[in-house]
Amino acid sequence: MSITLTDVQKDYSDKVQIGPVTTEIQSGGVTALVGPNGAGKSTILTMIGRLLDIDTGTITVAGQDVVNSPSKAIAKILSVLRQENHFVTRLTVRQLVGFGRFPHSRGRLTIGDEKYISEAIDFLNLTDLENRYLDQLSGGQRQRAYVAMVLAQNTDYVLLDEPLNNLDMQHAVQMMKQLRRAADELGRTIVIVLHDINFAAHYSDKILAMKDGKVVKHGTPAEIMQNEVLTEIFNTEVNVIDGPKGPLAVYY
């Protein structure tokens, strides 16, 4: 089972085009989408999640055609967290996480739904905050609550669009560790858009690099973390050195 894109294309204008993209993201582990601004990372992610229509091509997730399958069926195998989330701030953490069960409960939470909600809250270390309102949380706490919401949906595939945005170094590291745990301990397939190539290299199993709307490289961190590969992807000189916990890209 996998996420498969075949000749997927999105045209914004005669000069701005994403694709055609043909690639396969294997099930299991963490796959990071990297590349410069405007490369098409978020566009590809949101098309996989059916939040953005594709113009041509096909996308399948676990064998199901994303475009033609019923929304309810897709929502039971695939969850998505966008960059911008506009929820009512007077929701509590638990109420927010409960929205993740909507595809299953249709708004009528069962005992089973409450169990998944509690497990997601506990997994993201939010138990002490579950009755707090979102506007009473720090940015890092609020972002963890959103991730708990998509984990509570209990899908095999989880798509995350730049979840480290607006997080400081400490909270970004904590978030990546928790997503790594979700892949390793819960068996989720995590597909995540990241700006920091070093986070991608350390926490991902595979890296899919995009540039100018195309996939230019798809491989292991060891295959991507090469001077010439990163320099070509990011249009700036990058030197990869041996760090204490693996390769590090230096680009200052």
Regions found by a protein language model. Give the residues of each.
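ABC ATPase nucleotide-binding domains
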Residues: 233-252
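The feature captures the beta-strand-to-loop junction immediately N-terminal to the Walker
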Residues: 34-36
